[in-house]
Structure formats: structure tokens, C-alpha cells
UniProtKB/Swiss-Prot annotation:
GO-annotated molecular function: 2-acylglycerol O-acyltransferase activity; acetyltransferase activity; diacylglycerol O-acyltransferase activity
Pfam families according to UniProt: DAGAT
Tissue occurrence: Highly expressed in liver, small intestine, colon, stomach and kidney.
An example Gene Ontology biological process: intestinal absorption
Membrane topology: Multi-pass membrane protein
Annotated InterPro entries: DAGAT (IPR007130)
Function description: Involved in glycerolipid synthesis and lipid metabolism. Catalyzes the formation of diacylglycerol, the precursor of triacylglycerol, by transferring the acyl chain of a fatty acyl-CoA to a monoacylglycerol. Plays a central role in absorption of dietary fat in the small intestine by catalyzing the resynthesis of triacylglycerol in enterocytes. Has a preference toward monoacylglycerols containing unsaturated fatty acids in an order of C18:3 > C18:2 > C18:1 > C18:0 at sn-2.
Regulation affecting activity: Inhibited by oleic acid and sphingosine, while it is stimulated by phosphatidylcholine, phosphatidylserine and phosphatidic acid.
Transmembrane segment boundaries: 23-37, 38-59, 103-123
Domain of life: Eukaryota
UniProt KW keywords: Acyltransferase, Cytoplasm, Endoplasmic reticulum, Glycerol metabolism, Lipid biosynthesis, Lipid metabolism, Membrane, Transferase, Transmembrane, Transmembrane helix
Protein name: 2-acylglycerol O-acyltransferase 2
CDD domains found in the cross-reference section: LPLAT_MGAT-like (cd07987)
Length: 334
């Protein structure tokens, strides 16, 4: 039975839905449309635009791995405020961040579309710059997406950078500090476990971000986004199932995961690709001090990794009851 939305709704709520629809469209289809449009322009009287952009693209080819190109006006678009209010999304600070230092922030969980990570670190809708004055956030994204013309410039303007060591080093070595490099540690593969009530994190063997922190002496900041996994339902794909096998194979081949998810639609609540209206609260933990070690041993990496997991668990346990998570529910790692 399809549950339709009321015919008469406040314009505020309609604008919120439109803002989220724009985000989902951008996440799922904008890169592909930009690529097709770029090629199609070659066969029109506007072919010169493609040539000029290609020249610009070549000259600017290293920018995504050199800190990107923050454009504050785009980060402050009103549409992001409507998107934030749709769920709503809020950002909680538990400790200060020193603006004279550079940080690595581990963001958990990925969720299906990484809504919390984008809203908090790539827009000013939740007031990141006011909550953490002097800190400029960046968020790592698969290098693949920066190969899409026009789309690359759009995502760079929000603070997204490539997920390469060179990209991380450029940000973490900036003199004067004031940079936070966000890494969604579980990555695209973790999206396959994103469903309501799931607290499984892909972290047990993810140690690259820890090695980065040791190499650059950057404090580690654990971040947990409560409600991230509640935004969509997902077709059952338990470990060992044929669907999960296919998804894992495609993820290894293409570098992106393909969760079969569904939420609600624009005019009805029963099915569609728009996330449910469920609150997201992103809690930023206290920094973990890291001693700079240019060539860390496996033991040093493992020790810091275990400490990070412990601090992340402490952060989750300290706040879970506020979000009606059962007392006997704990984070699970794979």
C-alpha cells in the first residue's frame, strides 16, 4: 500500500525535500551527466567551450591533490540549510581543536550516501566554522570522481580532495595549521552494511589513516554520526549471500560499491531514492595526541589503531543513550 504525502504541505518542507533531491541527484548522476555533456558539446557549435575547458582542466589537473579549491560562497548556499533542516542534521563538539595544528578526523559510519560527512564538513549548514573557529575542513573522496569534467570543480569548491597520500600530505604539511582532513575510514565498502539499527564499522584492518597520523604527527579526531545508517533501507545482503558476493566483486573492480537501497519518494513515503526524515547528530570527539614518527613500525601503528578504536567506542558509549540506542548495543568491527 503506497502512502502518499499530503497534498498541501508548508513550502518550507517542500524546499527541504527539493534540496535533498538535488543532493541525491548530484551524488548518483551529476558526474555522469557532466561527462556526457562535455563530450556532446564537441559536436555542437559550442565545441570551443569544450576545448577551452580541456585546456583549463590540464593546467589545473593537480589541484584536487593539492588541497582543492574552497569557495566559501558555495559552502554557504541556502540550499544546504534546507538540506540540513530536512533531517535535521546537527554538529556536536566535545573538545576544542587548536587552530594552529592540522588534524586527521576519522568519520564513522559511511552510511549509504555519506550525508552527515558532506553536510558537516563540506557545507556551513551546521555551522562548522563557528563551532570550530580557525579550522578549515576537507573531506577525502575517491580519485575517480575528480576525473569528471565540471563535476570536479563543483566538488572541490565544497572542500573535497582526492583520497591519495599526496593529497593528505599536502594538507597535513601546511604551515600555520588550521586544517582538518576528514577520512570516511570504512569507505564505499562500508555502505553495504548501512541499514537501520546497524552499528558495524569496517575498521579492523583499516590502518592507513593511522600510519598517516604517525608520519605527520597529526592528532587523530574520532567522529561518530548517530542516525547516519537510519536514512535508507537496504535489500538483505548478508555476508556469504550471492548478492553480497556480486557487490564485493564489483567494488573491487570499479572501486565503488553498489548498495541496493531505497527510501521514500518526492510525493509518497513508500519507496524511492530520497532518504527518510530521520535526525543525524554528528559528534566530534577529543583529539588523540600522536608522536611524529617518520617510519612507524607495525607495532606502533597497531598500538595507535587500538587506542583510536577505544576512543571511538568511548565516544559512542557516552552518547548512545541520548539517541535511544539500547544500553547493551555496542559498536561491532569487521
Amino acid at each position: 500500500m503506497v502512502e502518499f504525502a499530503p497534498l498541501f504541505m508548508p513550502w518550507e518542507r517542500r524546499l527541504q525535500t527539493l534540496a535533498v533531491l538535488q543532493f541525491v541527484f548530484s551524488f548518483l548522476a551529476l558526474a555522469e551527466i557532466c561527462t556526457v555533456g562535455f563530450i556532446a558539446l564537441l559536436f555542437t557549435r559550442f565545441w570551443l567551450l569544450t576545448v577551452l575547458y580541456a585546456a583549463w582542466w590540464y593546467l589545473d589537473r593537480d589541484k584536487p591533490r593539492q588541497g582543492g579549491r574552497h569557495i566559501q560562497a558555495i559552502r554557504c548556499w541556502t540550499i544546504w540549510k534546507y538540506m540540513k533542516d530536512y533531517f535535521p542534521i546537527s554538529l556536536v563538539k566535545t573538545a576544542e581543536l587548536d587552530p594552529s595544528r592540522n588534524y586527521i578526523a576519522g568519520f564513522h559510519p559511511h552510511g549509504v550516501l555519506a550525508v552527515g560527512a558532506f553536510a558537516n564538513l563540506c557545507t556551513e549548514s551546521t555551522g562548522f566554522s563557528s563551532i570550530f573557529p580557525g579550522i578549515r575542513p576537507h573531506l577525502m573522496m575517491l580519485t575517480l570522481w575528480f576525473r569528471a569534467p565540471f563535476f570536479r570543480d563543483y566538488i572541490m569548491s565544497a572542500g573535497l580532495v582526492t583520497s591519495e597520500k599526496e593529497s593528505a600530505a599536502h594538507i597535513l604539511n601546511r604551515k600555520g595549521g588550521g586544517n582538518l582532513l576528514g577520512i570516511i575510514v570504512g569507505g564505499a565498502q562500508e555502505a553495504l552494511d548501512a541499514r537501520p539499527g546497524s552499528f558495524t564499522l569496517l575498521l579492523r584492518n583499516r590502518k592507513g589513516f593511522v600510519r598517516l597520523a604517525l608520519t605527520h604527527g597529526a592528532p587523530l579526531v574520532p567522529i561518530f554520526s548517530f542516525g547516519e545508517n537510519d536514512l535508507f533501507d537496504q535489500i538483505p545482503n548478508s555476508s556469504g549471500s550471492w548478492l553480497r558476493y556480486i557487490q564485493n566483486r564489483l567494488q573491487k573492480i570499479m572501486g565503488i560499491s553498489l548498495p541496493l537501497f531505497h527510501g521514500r519518494g518526492v510525493f509518497q513515503y513508500s519507496f524511492g531514492l530520497i532518504p527518510y526524515r530521520r535526525p543525524i547528530t554528528t559528534v566530534v570527539g577529543k583529539p588523540i595526541e600522536v608522536q611524529k614518527t617518520l617510519h612507524p613500525s607495525e607495532e606502533e601503528v597497531n598500538q595507535l589503531h587500538q587506542r583510536y578504536i577505544k576512543e571511538l567506542c568511548n565516544l559512542f558509549e557516552a552518547h548512545k543513550l541520548k539517541f535511544n540506542i539500547p544500553a547493551d548495543q555496542h559498536l561491532e568491527f569487521c
